[in-house]
Amino acid sequence: MIHLDTVTKRYGRAYAVQDVTLTAAAEATTVLIGPSGSGKSTLLRLMIGLTRPDAGTVTVDGRRLTTSTAQALRQRMGYVIQEGGLFPHLTGRANAAVMAHHLGWPHDRIDARIEELVRLVQLDPDRLSQYPNELSGGQRQRVSLMRALMLDPDVLLLDEPLGALDPMIRADLQDDLRDIFRRLGKTVVFVTHDIGEAAFFGDRVVLLREGQIEQTGPMASLLDAPASPFVTDFIQAQRAPLEHLRTEDRE
Protein backbone atom coordinates (compact mmCIF):
# COMPACT_ATOMS: atom_id res chain seq x y z
CA MET A 1 0.00 0.00 0.00
CA ILE A 2 1.14 3.55 -0.76
CA HIS A 3 -0.24 6.53 1.14
CA LEU A 4 0.27 10.22 0.38
CA ASP A 5 -0.72 12.66 3.12
CA THR A 6 -1.27 16.30 2.06
CA VAL A 7 1.59 16.12 -0.42
CA THR A 8 2.68 19.24 -2.30
CA LYS A 9 5.35 19.59 -5.00
CA ARG A 10 6.35 22.88 -6.62
CA TYR A 11 8.64 23.71 -9.50
CA GLY A 12 9.51 27.33 -8.97
CA ARG A 13 6.25 29.08 -8.19
CA ALA A 14 4.12 26.57 -10.08
CA TYR A 15 2.38 23.76 -8.21
CA ALA A 16 2.74 20.37 -9.90
CA VAL A 17 0.88 18.69 -7.01
CA GLN A 18 -0.98 20.52 -4.25
CA ASP A 19 -2.29 19.09 -0.96
CA VAL A 20 -2.95 15.61 -2.35
CA THR A 21 -4.05 12.88 0.05
CA LEU A 22 -4.34 9.51 -1.62
CA THR A 23 -4.09 5.80 -0.84
CA ALA A 24 -3.20 3.17 -3.42
CA ALA A 25 -4.58 -0.01 -1.89
CA ALA A 26 -2.85 -3.37 -1.78
CA GLU A 27 -3.92 -5.97 -4.35
CA ALA A 28 -5.75 -3.34 -6.40
CA THR A 29 -5.10 -1.11 -9.40
CA THR A 30 -5.33 2.64 -8.84
CA VAL A 31 -5.46 4.65 -12.07
CA LEU A 32 -4.28 8.26 -12.18
CA ILE A 33 -5.97 10.06 -15.05
CA GLY A 34 -6.15 13.64 -16.23
CA PRO A 35 -5.04 16.01 -18.98
CA SER A 36 -1.39 16.83 -19.68
CA GLY A 37 0.12 18.85 -16.85
CA SER A 38 -2.39 17.68 -14.25
CA GLY A 39 0.30 16.10 -12.03
CA LYS A 40 -0.03 12.39 -12.90
CA SER A 41 3.63 11.66 -13.59
CA THR A 42 4.79 13.88 -10.74
CA LEU A 43 2.65 11.86 -8.32
CA LEU A 44 4.20 8.65 -9.62
CA ARG A 45 7.71 10.05 -9.18
CA LEU A 46 6.81 11.09 -5.63
CA MET A 47 5.55 7.57 -4.90
CA ILE A 48 8.79 5.96 -6.02
CA GLY A 49 11.04 8.55 -4.41
CA LEU A 50 12.49 9.97 -7.62
CA THR A 51 11.45 13.42 -6.46
CA ARG A 52 10.83 14.72 -2.94
CA PRO A 53 7.71 16.53 -1.75
CA ASP A 54 7.97 20.12 -0.59
CA ALA A 55 5.32 19.33 2.01
CA GLY A 56 3.48 16.24 3.22
CA THR A 57 4.58 12.62 3.52
CA VAL A 58 4.70 9.49 1.38
CA THR A 59 4.60 6.07 3.07
CA VAL A 60 5.02 2.63 1.54
CA ASP A 61 3.56 -0.22 3.60
CA GLY A 62 3.76 2.00 6.67
CA ARG A 63 7.37 3.15 6.16
CA ARG A 64 7.95 6.80 5.39
CA LEU A 65 9.73 7.44 2.10
CA THR A 66 12.72 9.69 2.84
CA THR A 67 16.21 10.23 1.49
CA SER A 68 17.54 7.57 3.86
CA THR A 69 14.84 4.96 3.14
CA ALA A 70 14.29 5.61 -0.58
CA GLN A 71 16.86 3.14 -1.91
CA ALA A 72 15.63 0.22 0.21
CA LEU A 73 11.96 0.96 -0.47
CA ARG A 74 12.60 1.43 -4.19
CA GLN A 75 13.78 -2.18 -4.38
CA ARG A 76 10.24 -3.16 -3.39
CA MET A 77 8.80 -1.22 -6.34
CA GLY A 78 8.80 -1.88 -10.07
CA TYR A 79 8.60 1.04 -12.50
CA VAL A 80 7.58 1.04 -16.18
CA ILE A 81 7.57 4.18 -18.33
CA GLN A 82 6.01 4.97 -21.70
CA GLU A 83 9.00 4.25 -23.93
CA GLY A 84 10.28 1.39 -21.78
CA GLY A 85 13.48 3.15 -20.69
CA LEU A 86 15.66 0.24 -21.78
CA PHE A 87 19.43 0.62 -22.07
CA PRO A 88 20.18 0.59 -25.82
CA HIS A 89 23.59 -1.10 -25.43
CA LEU A 90 22.16 -4.08 -23.49
CA THR A 91 20.22 -7.06 -24.80
CA GLY A 92 16.69 -7.69 -23.65
CA ARG A 93 17.95 -10.28 -21.19
CA ALA A 94 20.58 -7.97 -19.73
CA ASN A 95 18.03 -5.16 -19.45
CA ALA A 96 15.59 -7.42 -17.60
CA ALA A 97 18.29 -8.59 -15.19
CA VAL A 98 20.12 -5.30 -14.62
CA MET A 99 18.96 -4.80 -11.01
CA ALA A 100 19.52 -8.45 -10.11
CA HIS A 101 23.11 -8.18 -11.38
CA HIS A 102 23.55 -4.94 -9.44
CA LEU A 103 22.45 -6.71 -6.24
CA GLY A 104 24.80 -9.63 -6.88
CA TRP A 105 22.28 -12.37 -7.57
CA PRO A 106 23.94 -15.65 -8.65
CA HIS A 107 23.53 -16.58 -12.31
CA ASP A 108 21.35 -19.61 -11.62
CA ARG A 109 18.89 -17.49 -9.64
CA ILE A 110 18.77 -14.91 -12.43
CA ASP A 111 18.25 -17.63 -15.04
CA ALA A 112 15.36 -19.14 -13.08
CA ARG A 113 13.67 -15.76 -12.59
CA ILE A 114 14.09 -14.85 -16.28
CA GLU A 115 12.47 -18.16 -17.23
CA GLU A 116 9.48 -17.42 -14.95
CA LEU A 117 9.05 -13.88 -16.23
CA VAL A 118 9.34 -14.62 -19.92
CA ARG A 119 6.39 -16.98 -19.52
CA LEU A 120 4.46 -14.48 -17.41
CA VAL A 121 4.76 -11.60 -19.89
CA GLN A 122 4.36 -13.94 -22.89
CA LEU A 123 7.54 -12.88 -24.69
CA ASP A 124 9.30 -15.09 -27.22
CA PRO A 125 12.53 -16.13 -25.40
CA ASP A 126 14.52 -15.58 -28.60
CA ARG A 127 13.81 -11.86 -28.30
CA LEU A 128 15.92 -11.67 -25.13
CA SER A 129 19.12 -11.93 -27.18
CA GLN A 130 18.15 -8.87 -29.22
CA TYR A 131 18.81 -5.21 -28.51
CA PRO A 132 16.00 -2.69 -27.93
CA ASN A 133 16.25 -1.22 -31.44
CA GLU A 134 15.61 -4.71 -32.84
CA LEU A 135 12.39 -5.16 -30.87
CA SER A 136 8.88 -3.90 -31.58
CA GLY A 137 7.30 -1.39 -29.21
CA GLY A 138 5.22 -4.09 -27.57
CA GLN A 139 8.24 -6.37 -27.13
CA ARG A 140 10.23 -3.55 -25.54
CA GLN A 141 7.41 -2.94 -23.07
CA ARG A 142 7.30 -6.64 -22.19
CA VAL A 143 11.05 -6.57 -21.48
CA SER A 144 10.54 -3.41 -19.42
CA LEU A 145 7.81 -5.19 -17.46
CA MET A 146 10.17 -8.12 -16.85
CA ARG A 147 12.76 -5.71 -15.48
CA ALA A 148 10.16 -4.08 -13.22
CA LEU A 149 9.08 -7.47 -11.86
CA MET A 150 12.57 -9.00 -11.58
CA LEU A 151 12.91 -8.42 -7.84
CA ASP A 152 9.29 -9.49 -7.18
CA PRO A 153 8.26 -6.04 -5.92
CA ASP A 154 5.25 -5.37 -3.71
CA VAL A 155 4.31 -2.31 -5.77
CA LEU A 156 4.16 -1.82 -9.54
CA LEU A 157 4.03 1.70 -11.01
CA LEU A 158 3.37 2.27 -14.71
CA ASP A 159 3.56 5.67 -16.43
CA GLU A 160 1.50 5.52 -19.64
CA PRO A 161 3.02 2.16 -20.67
CA LEU A 162 0.68 1.79 -23.67
CA GLY A 163 0.78 5.36 -24.94
CA ALA A 164 3.43 4.94 -27.66
CA LEU A 165 2.12 1.68 -29.11
CA ASP A 166 0.08 1.14 -32.25
CA PRO A 167 -3.56 0.12 -31.65
CA MET A 168 -3.28 -3.64 -32.30
CA ILE A 169 -0.14 -4.12 -30.20
CA ARG A 170 -1.69 -1.92 -27.54
CA ALA A 171 -4.84 -4.05 -27.38
CA ASP A 172 -2.84 -7.28 -26.99
CA LEU A 173 -0.59 -5.88 -24.28
CA GLN A 174 -3.54 -4.30 -22.48
CA ASP A 175 -5.24 -7.68 -22.09
CA ASP A 176 -2.02 -9.31 -20.93
CA LEU A 177 -1.26 -6.55 -18.43
CA ARG A 178 -4.64 -6.82 -16.73
CA ASP A 179 -4.24 -10.58 -16.48
CA ILE A 180 -0.78 -10.13 -14.93
CA PHE A 181 -2.09 -7.59 -12.40
CA ARG A 182 -4.85 -9.96 -11.32
CA ARG A 183 -2.57 -12.99 -11.06
CA LEU A 184 0.16 -11.27 -9.06
CA GLY A 185 -2.12 -9.37 -6.66
CA LYS A 186 0.23 -6.43 -6.17
CA THR A 187 -0.37 -2.77 -5.43
CA VAL A 188 -0.56 -1.26 -8.93
CA VAL A 189 -0.59 2.44 -9.84
CA PHE A 190 -1.27 3.07 -13.53
CA VAL A 191 -1.03 6.50 -15.20
CA THR A 192 -3.00 7.29 -18.34
CA HIS A 193 -4.88 10.13 -20.03
CA ASP A 194 -7.30 7.68 -21.67
CA ILE A 195 -10.67 7.00 -20.02
CA GLY A 196 -10.95 3.66 -21.83
CA GLU A 197 -7.73 2.46 -20.19
CA ALA A 198 -8.88 3.85 -16.85
CA ALA A 199 -12.13 1.90 -17.06
CA PHE A 200 -10.33 -1.25 -18.24
CA PHE A 201 -7.66 -1.36 -15.53
CA GLY A 202 -8.91 0.67 -12.60
CA ASP A 203 -10.40 -0.68 -9.40
CA ARG A 204 -10.23 2.96 -8.39
CA VAL A 205 -9.79 6.00 -10.63
CA VAL A 206 -8.29 9.31 -9.50
CA LEU A 207 -9.01 12.22 -11.84
CA LEU A 208 -6.52 15.06 -11.45
CA ARG A 209 -6.83 18.70 -12.40
CA GLU A 210 -3.95 21.17 -12.05
CA GLY A 211 -2.23 19.08 -9.39
CA GLN A 212 -5.30 18.39 -7.27
CA ILE A 213 -7.81 15.55 -7.05
CA GLU A 214 -11.03 16.50 -8.80
CA GLN A 215 -12.87 13.21 -8.23
CA THR A 216 -12.03 9.68 -7.17
CA GLY A 217 -13.88 6.36 -7.13
CA PRO A 218 -14.81 3.54 -9.49
CA MET A 219 -14.94 4.65 -13.13
CA ALA A 220 -18.70 4.11 -13.09
CA SER A 221 -19.08 6.83 -10.45
CA LEU A 222 -17.23 9.35 -12.62
CA LEU A 223 -19.41 8.46 -15.58
CA ASP A 224 -22.73 8.35 -13.72
CA ALA A 225 -22.22 11.09 -11.13
CA PRO A 226 -19.52 13.54 -12.23
CA ALA A 227 -18.52 15.80 -9.35
CA SER A 228 -17.98 18.94 -11.43
CA PRO A 229 -18.33 20.38 -14.94
CA PHE A 230 -14.62 19.64 -15.44
CA VAL A 231 -15.23 15.90 -14.95
CA THR A 232 -18.11 15.99 -17.42
CA ASP A 233 -16.06 17.93 -19.97
CA PHE A 234 -13.00 15.69 -19.60
CA ILE A 235 -15.04 12.54 -20.22
CA GLN A 236 -17.10 14.09 -23.00
CA ALA A 237 -13.99 15.33 -24.81
CA GLN A 238 -12.86 11.71 -25.28
CA ARG A 239 -16.30 10.44 -26.18
CA ALA A 240 -17.14 13.23 -28.65
CA PRO A 241 -14.98 12.07 -31.61
CA LEU A 242 -16.52 8.60 -31.49
CA GLU A 243 -20.04 10.01 -31.23
CA HIS A 244 -19.29 12.28 -34.20
CA LEU A 245 -18.17 9.30 -36.27
CA ARG A 246 -21.29 7.34 -35.33
CA THR A 247 -23.47 10.28 -36.39
CA GLU A 248 -21.69 10.48 -39.75
CA ASP A 249 -22.14 6.73 -40.28
CA ARG A 250 -25.88 6.99 -39.64
CA GLU A 251 -26.17 9.84 -42.12
Where are these regions (language model features)?
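ABC ATPase "signature
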Residues: 216-217, 225
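ABC ATPase NBD coupling module
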Residues: 64-78, 102, 108, 222-226
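Conserved ABC ATPase signature
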Residues: 131-135, 139
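Conserved catalytic motifs of ABC-family nucleotide-binding domains
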Residues: 152
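Helix-to-loop junction immediately C-terminal to a conserved catalytic motif
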Residues: 48
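Conserved ABC ATPase "signature" C-loop
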Residues: 210-212
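Conserved ABC ATPase "signature" region
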Residues: 101, 108-126, 179
